[in-house]
Amino acid sequence: MKKQPQQKERVSRWKGTYFKRNFVFILLIACIPGLLTGGAIYFLSIDKVEKELQRSHETQVAREVSRMDEKLGVLELALTQMAYDSSLMNGLAERDLEKDFTFSYQLTKKLFLLRDQQPLIEQASIFLNSPRPLVLSPEYSALTEQEALRKYRSLLASDHSIYWKRSGNQAMLIQLIPGAAEKPFGAIMLAVDPKEMESILQSLSPYPDGSALLLDQNREVLFHEGEKDFEKTLLHEIKKQPAENGHFQMEWKGKVYSVSFGEMNRMHQQWTFVSAAPLSAITAPMVFLSKVIIVMLVICIGLAVCMTWYASKKIYRPIQHLLGLFTGGEKKTWQASGQDEFKWIEKRWQDLSLESRKLQQQLLRQTPHMKKSFLQHLLQSDFYYDNEESLRFRMEEAGWNIGGNVFHVLDLQVTGLRCEKSIFREGDEQLAVFTLTNIAEELAAKRVFQLSILDIGRLSVTVLVMKTNSSDLKAYITELARQFGDVTGLCLTSTLSSKTERVTEIPSLFQDVKCGKSRRKFANRDQVIDLQADFPRDEQFAPYYPFELEKQIVQTIRLERKQEAKELIDGCMKELSEKAAIDRHVHSALIQLFSRIQEDILHSGLNPSELFQHRNPFLDISELREPNEAAAWLMDVVVTPYLSKLEGRKNRQQKQLAERVIAMIHEQYMADISLESCADALGMNSYTLSKAFKQVTGINFIDYVTQIRIEKAKELLVNTNKKIHDVSEEVGYRHNYFNRIFKKQVGMPPGVFRQMYQETP
């Protein structure tokens, strides 16, 4: 009972002059423009629109004719190219296709390919008159019937090397071969698909009652699309026209048709195209539409009066809604104050704006952390199920200004921490990355583009770059590397992804960069890896590995020659950096070398986990970026601890004995050498010698002799032409036993091994 007087008072307050004025104003806005537009369309524009539609139809016909001419031209060009293909046509007259299956297959394949590439072709075939008449259609078929042979030979009597010919109800394109010869010995024949041509002709007259024709030089119908009775009348009217091209109007069955016709030059022939469209179908929709507009306007006037009344009642509702939003629980306070609605809204707006600014300042302080967190989750594909619009919205919320920018992912890898020029040392990795981040941000600010940097550890940072134009991004990378090197003495490897306009593709770019950075050269110098560029095909070959150096390194480690092992490892790293070149190949080689050394460690009875202090050597290898660093890691982490452990387990006399035995094996491996003979020569027990030899080398005496003999046999098989029997005798084996032991050790007989390596370029 208390709310009813307030409801009445509120309604009577806004239904006054403001309501009436707005009612009349809205009614005028709704009615007058529509009446003026409808009248202008109906009384002034019908004639112009009809002419414009007619011109538009003629333009469409010309455009579709041009497309049809282009498609036929492409067909002719494809046939000509095949006729002048020297790899197929040279010597074709002398080839016996019945016996030369390879060449017949190539011709048949070419015909299939030509038919598949050209949708206009229904059938492609080749007729050869010599050395024996035959047809490839595209299957091989000899011509024995004289009537068929006479029909095909008549194709060769044309004065033109390429021409169109009507064959029954089908049009064929004929190319004589060879194209430039006076006496052709064959022809390539393409039969045009009538259904495809009907589809093309349909575009000349897309109206339901329209028709389109394509006539040859004798004005006979080649292709048609439409009603046959109408086409006969249309053809009769075309033949009466004195001009070669133009347009006219004709009447048929109470309908007026607009007819356009013209000529097309097709290989020394003049074809005629005809397009007929009902004029009523072109212009009637506009007349009908204008009448509909007038009727609708009359109806709309009545509706406008009702809707204007309803809309005017709704005009005050936005103000009422705003008051509800801004007043909240203070509605009674506003009513008691008697203040104007808009002034009250203005006051509340200012209060809310002040609160909003405070919240924005707090948000700005958290924005860098939000950006890094979002970028980290984005790169890790944590937003896999989010769509593009959602990700863009979240990025803009996090503080990025995306706009029309394109995205690049850039990986910056710092190298040279052990270099003499470096101002940093081990343990300063975070400081080096911090310096790089500052220089990158300052340089980006000067070049006016956005970037976000994420430290992913191991002296590497990932950068998300946003630019409207990526043309100067390489210049930025070059300048960044130069400034960073001048300040720190370190080198920088930059891996640049391809560009994308989609946020959802950024994780894929990050994965590409992670894989692509392994293409860097294994050297301490500034490098730029642009994943948009094509890389040399050489990188697809098998990576290089110095097997001989590996043997020498392992042997020197077995003999505990630390300095010699260091020199060999330095040489190996230098050779790998020059020949294996890129990171992933060098890392694979390092893993192989490490595994070989670890095998010896296991043979010696040591536990690699305890020796390496439970660290992950393979992870360490993946982080090596330069030869000096790799050599130092092998010596410091692998060789030196291993040799230190061995010093307390082996005595010098055993090593000297092993060295003397190894020397004897290398000198006498081709003879009947045995452990007993070596023990007799050294004046000691064979059991003691065997135990000492295995403790030093990691393998027993027989296996070592077998290994030396097999390696020598491999060298003789690959580098000489000696018989396998002679090779077996030179390495100290009988022929039959040599084959068995070689296959057991290598996995294949010696003959197969020689053939495989001699065939390898």
Swiss-Prot record:
GO MF annotations in UniProt: DNA-binding transcription factor activity; sequence-specific DNA binding
Q: Where in the cell is it found?
A: Cell membrane
Residue intervals on the Extracellular side = 44-285
Cytoplasmic topological domain: 1-22, 307-761
Q: Keywords, A to Z?
A: Cell membrane, DNA-binding, Membrane, Transcription, Transcription regulation, Transmembrane, Transmembrane helix
Q: What induces it?
A: By rhamnogalacturonan type I (RG-I), a component of pectin from the plant cell wall.
Return the annotated DNA-binding positions.
676-697
UniProt-listed SMART domains: HTH_ARAC
- The entry's protein name is HTH-type transcriptional regulator YesS
